[in-house]
């Protein structure tokens, strides 16, 4: 029976002086004519296991092809070594090469490789230590989010990927068709949001959420934007703006704390590699009340520091840039902040129109280092108000009649939000570029393999 490095590293004392059998890949190799030290990784942990090969046990002539990246199967006696930095090592009794290299130029060498270089080989970069940590935390975060919603009584809803509706109204969509250009007999795109369809399912299930790929044909070449990313979108019938904000904050605080508690070693690694205060900063947010201000107040605060911005044209109705969002979180509040009641011209057509006639019941949750992490709103449930807004924006009413019809039959109103999964992972890990927290990034002018 095979053991994993993760199992052994968690309780090395249980395996002390016992025989272990492990399959994995060589990440480091050094030695001389009498003894060879091999570091092995099997993917179960970002940690490597040191394996000691001695000439009296192993025929070195049969393992002359050992090199970085080679796949092997080893058996031997494990020794727990708490007095050293490593958790233990294996004195190898047998070693079998399971996958040789065809040449000596294995892409992930034992030297510092820049993130820019690693982006050019997304099919290999997860075999570096940093990306093992990132991808393990990505997986852990994925499951913590599903666990949170299950405990809160939500139904997981699979929104369609192909759709005839642009839920955001920005027109930044990828058009899908077959070679004959008439497969659906109407314009069909990859979904930019699952929200509209989730609203339909919230009327019946009350609490639903989607967690799925999302596609935006944004040509923004920034470190925060990707053409394909994952989005978490809960929708709750009967909820007001304040209730959905409370849910958003609770979600973040719960999943962040859980990921930190369950992945201590990964965070220690990240702190050594980058932000020394990563966990302290995240846990401070998890244990704090989040400040909430109006969009109007945000503009007032930013105007007091107008000279510090590249974009100095600040007024009621302007779209806040990333530099403004980050300034609010990093220089004024020093932690995440929620902004509510945006001008309606800045937001999507479906948002509840406030009594002032100028703003909508929308919110953005901003975090340091990134800016907007979550965007959400209370939905407009009044049929005539929604229809008037859609007409004002020259939308195709016929295409959205099904969405309008949701207002006709027992609709108490609903609220929801969208949370970018990769942006959340950036915030949690301190990684600064969205291309480095997704396995195979797709951005403008870039689609490797």
Curated annotation (Swiss-Prot):
InterPro entries the UniProt entry points to: Aa-tRNA-synt_II (IPR004364), aa-tRNA-synth_II (IPR006195), aa-tRNA-synth_II/BPL/LPL (IPR045864), Asn-tRNA-ligase (IPR004522), Asp/Asn-tRNA-synth_IIb (IPR002312), NA-bd_OB-fold (IPR012340), NA-bd_OB_tRNA (IPR004365)
Enzyme Commission number(s) of this protein: 6.1.1.22
Coiled-coil annotated spans: none
Keyword Nucleotide-binding appears in the UniProt entry: yes
Source species, domain of life: Bacteria
Places the protein is found: Cytoplasm
GO molecular function: asparagine-tRNA ligase activity; ATP binding; nucleic acid binding
Family as reported in the entry's similarity comment: Belongs to the class-II aminoacyl-tRNA synthetase family.
SUPFAM superfamilies: Class II aaRS and biotin synthetases, Nucleic acid-binding proteins
Keywords annotated in UniProt: Aminoacyl-tRNA synthetase, ATP-binding, Cytoplasm, Ligase, Nucleotide-binding, Protein biosynthesis
GO biological process: asparaginyl-tRNA aminoacylation
Source organism (scientific name): Mesomycoplasma hyopneumoniae (strain J / ATCC 25934 / NCTC 10110)
Subunit structure: Homodimer.
Any one Gene Ontology cellular component term annotated for this protein: cytoplasm
Identification of the protein by name: Asparagine--tRNA ligase
Protein's UniProt keywords contain Transcription regulation: no
Catalytic reactions of this protein: tRNA(Asn) + L-asparagine + ATP = L-asparaginyl-tRNA(Asn) + AMP + diphosphate + H(+)
